Amino acid sequence: MVVSADCRISLSAPSCIRSSSTGLTRHIKLGSFCNGELMGKKLNLSQLPNIRLRSSTNFSQKRILMSLNSVAGESKVQELETEKRDPRTVASIILGGGAGTRLFPLTKRRAKPAVPIGGAYRLIDVPMSNCINSGINKVYILTQYNSASLNRHLARAYNSNGLGFGDGYVEVLAATQTPGESGKRWFQGTADAVRQFHWLFEDARSKDIEDVLILSGDHLYRMDYMDFIQDHRQSGADISISCIPIDDRRASDFGLMKIDDKGRVISFSEKPKGDDLKAMAVDTTILGLSKEEAEKKPYIASMGVYVFKKEILLNLLRWRFPTANDFGSEIIPFSAKEFYVNAYLFNDYWEDIGTIRSFFEANLALTEHPGAFSFYDAAKPIYTSRRNLPPSKIDNSKLIDSIISHGSFLTNCLIEHSIVGIRSRVGSNVQLKDTVMLGADYYETEAEVAALLAEGNVPIGIGENTKIQECIIDKNARVGKNVIIANSEGIQEADRSSDGFYIRSGITVILKNSVIKDGVVI
């Protein structure tokens, strides 16, 4: 300890404060000194309860300063932050193996995280980009159903593309079978999927991993995961859950929780209904909402984004709940009774793209200005694969509140409140309203288009004089001339796969690679 001429006391630089009561080296307890303790008395650090000094290269080595004001006799302890925001101690697991039945038919031939969004991206790009922007460079993606296009996209977008993973990695882990009876099972749920790869965190390259971030591959949001992890570490929690306040209309679709005034989860229920749902209502002013906002959103919903201490995760999956298959319905509710589960409020846009309706509305919301979510954030971009496509070519067309992706051709058409995906072709006198076109995987040359038309066939894209609204058009679809897609009868559900379309929640979905012939009315 050194006392300078200007009455400044400083502890030696390598010293770090740690809580001996918890044994956690990454948390700090600061001593509080009143005037009487400093003025005219010798400072005795050994008398401070539950605090000891330790020198370690694993700590942020900062100097503790205490200023003595001889006039006012006041003292101040400079608040220190010893916890490093070190993403190298975090590994991320993105769950991408679900069957995606609620998003069918968009998931008929692709995994849910591979579903296109925003005209040029895929859902998997959202958590991947959040990891990159947060500095987390150790990422695993667990896949099972229809994973071919997802694997191809990940290989093109995130391997050897200069995004700076350094000593990190992006690894796709497909569901596999191994010798023995227990090794013949596919993933039975989110927790079981992670359990089957628990050995990854016993590997030598995972020795520095302290926390495991569990993410879903079908959400739309922008989040700094290190803020979340920092809160988790400072709270001392075993598990942390990112949450949002939510209204009555959607509450039963999510895991709901009750928390105490310190943010600790005291009760958790996965997708409750009826009286069980009403029992989960809380006063959400505890989250900082106004009284009016709290009345509109009386529930606290899990985002399905979790942080586990590595040792706790392995203990839960291997020993404490070895037969539990799902995080939301089994692991989290049980853990809330025995472990310290912390709630982290995410106060920004978040959408679960789990149904055709939510997918449709989230896409069209991107056309609004200002939008609740934007892909146009240069500081925290959403990455995707490089396609080297030219700008879109638009001839004598009218565009209203729409997004036109690169490489498209629009001729003498009206596009209103719609998204046009990459490589799209929209013919003369076409009217699109409230429509999401996912685009095409390849171009047809002008000669090929002319030949198809001469033979009475339909090229990729939308033929002239066609009118479409309230519709999702999947990739490589061929919609002919003079077609009307409007669902004028208001049908909510229909399966017409032989005719190239489904209707889900009143939204017409044109199937991938399907053909809608000239003059058809849907």
UniProtKB/Swiss-Prot annotation:
Leaves. SUPFAM superfamilies: Nucleotide-diphospho-sugar transferases, Trimeric LpxA-like enzymes. Pfam families: LbH_GLGC, NTP_transferase. GO terms for cellular component: chloroplast; chloroplast envelope; chloroplast stroma. Residues 1-54 form a transit peptide. This is Glucose-1-phosphate adenylyltransferase large subunit 1, chloroplastic. PANTHER family: GLUCOSE-1-PHOSPHATE ADENYLYLTRANSFERASE LARGE SUBUNIT 1, CHLOROPLASTIC-RELATED (PTHR43523:SF12), GLUCOSE-1-PHOSPHATE ADENYLYLTRANSFERASE-RELATED (PTHR43523). One of its GO terms (molecular function) is glucose-1-phosphate adenylyltransferase activity. Transmembrane segments: none annotated. It comes from Arabidopsis thaliana (Mouse-ear cress). Belongs to the bacterial/plant glucose-1-phosphate adenylyltransferase family.
